[in-house]
């Protein structure tokens, strides 16, 4: 059974320097060190705002132009610093859970003309290897069943619902277009059915 292991206060956010609480968990079957970042005691809210964010070293840490992961994380932190909410930061590197080295191999193939899905398939992987059952278990450990989910990804909605989480509302993020990631975002929209508004 998943339960809260430890919690500590800290400040986060490039612009906001917002107070938050960082939580670790016991009982995660994968052994991965997933964490929760909680703003304004959001777990006490009737229907908290929640985002699941898969670790992306190149985007989150190095601000790579190949994806929009860092921008999505920064956007969510700023929103939740103001409104409250929970970020479940999932240690499944790469948007498809490939692992870092396989992700680098996929980048190489993308440089040769493949889109992100074609590159992953060429390496022998399915479109999306991530699964979100442990995210649902983390929410359950916090006593949360009903959420407002911040996502553009229909797979996240489906996986959480299949694991007993009731999604009251879906809140989209912006399409963070920049030099180098337009093809990536459009592949997610056309192939992965992600819901983007490219006019924003």
From Swiss-Prot:
GO terms for cellular component: cytosol. It catalyses: GTP + 4 H2O = 2,5-diamino-6-hydroxy-4-(5-phosphoribosylamino)-pyrimidine + formate + 2 phosphate + 3 H(+). GO terms for biological process: riboflavin biosynthetic process. Binds 1 zinc ion per subunit. Pathway: Cofactor biosynthesis; riboflavin biosynthesis; 5-amino-6-(D-ribitylamino)uracil from GTP: step 1/4. The keyword tRNA-binding does not apply. InterPro entries: GTP_cyclohydro_II, RibA, RibA-like_sf. GTP binds at residues 51-55, 72, 93-95, 116, 151, 156. Pfam families: GTP_cyclohydro2. Its EC number is 3.5.4.25. Keywords: GTP-binding, Hydrolase, Metal-binding, Nucleotide-binding, Riboflavin biosynthesis, Zinc. PANTHER family: 3,4-DIHYDROXY-2-BUTANONE 4-PHOSPHATE SYNTHASE (PTHR21327:SF18), GTP CYCLOHYDROLASE II-RELATED (PTHR21327). HAMAP family: RibA. Catalyzes the conversion of GTP to 2,5-diamino-6-ribosylamino-4(3H)-pyrimidinone 5'-phosphate (DARP), formate and pyrophosphate. Belongs to the GTP cyclohydrolase II family. This is GTP cyclohydrolase-2. The gene is ribA.
């Amino acid at each position: 059974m998943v339960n809260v292991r430890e919690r500590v206060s800290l400040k986060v956010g490039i612009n906001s320097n917002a107070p938050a609480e960082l939580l670790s968990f016991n009982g995660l079957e994968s052994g991965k060190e997933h964490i929760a970042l909680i703003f304004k005691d959001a777990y006490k809210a009737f229907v908290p705002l929640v985002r699941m964010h898969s670790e992306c070293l190149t985007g989150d840490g190095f601000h790579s132009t190949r994806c929009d992961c860092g921008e999505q994380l920064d956007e969510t932190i700023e929103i939740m610093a103001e409104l409250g909410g929970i970020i479940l930061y999932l240690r499944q590197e790469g948007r498809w859970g490939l692992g870092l080295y396989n992700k680098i191999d996929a980048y190489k193939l993308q440089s040769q003309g493949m889109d992100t899905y074609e590159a992953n398939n060429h390496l022998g992987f399915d479109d999306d290897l991530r699964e979100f059952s442990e995210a649902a278990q983390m929410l359950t450990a916090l006593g949360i069943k009903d959420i407002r989910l911040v996502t553009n990804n229909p797979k996240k909605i489906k996986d959480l619902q299949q694991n007993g989480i009731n999604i009251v509302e879906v809140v989209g993020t912006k399409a963070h277009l920049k030099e180098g990631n337009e093809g990536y975002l459009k592949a997610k929209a056309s192939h992965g059915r992600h819901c983007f508004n490219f006019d924003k």
